[in-house]
């Protein structure tokens, strides 16, 4: 017998600080874009935060007279959010596995500037152990700054052929 809707307890938020979220990513400084996981539910959604600093190297030349955070870096932050949710929903990457971006369709509608706190709300569209599709909305102060639909593929390095590194 299930509880009536009014008797169900709301799900507690699950969060991660910077130190813990780094354990889910292979990226290291200066390529870790996320600062915090605000909430997540495996197989369903993740909500992450990125604080944009005026000291970010990418802003030095983009643009000197009026700093605008590059959309390519926003896409990387979204990808990192997806990588974390993908692993939380399936399993951690094995030592010889990587995630590759399969496809991206994005639209950015407002500039992101130093001092902005960007919230990424990423929702799972479909999920398999080796493939993940998602949609994401990026906001600053509750206003949309961009939307993205994408996919990730989990691959073993051995499956990708000989490597030059």
UniProtKB/Swiss-Prot annotation:
The keyword Transcription does not apply. Its EC number is 4.2.1.-. It is an enzyme of class 4 (lyase). Pfam families: FabA. Pathway: Phytotoxin biosynthesis; coronatine biosynthesis. The active site is at 62. Keywords: Lyase. The keyword Flavoprotein does not apply. GO terms for molecular function: lyase activity. Belongs to the thioester dehydratase family. This is Coronafacic acid dehydratase. It comes from Pseudomonas savastanoi pv. glycinea (Pseudomonas syringae pv. glycinea).
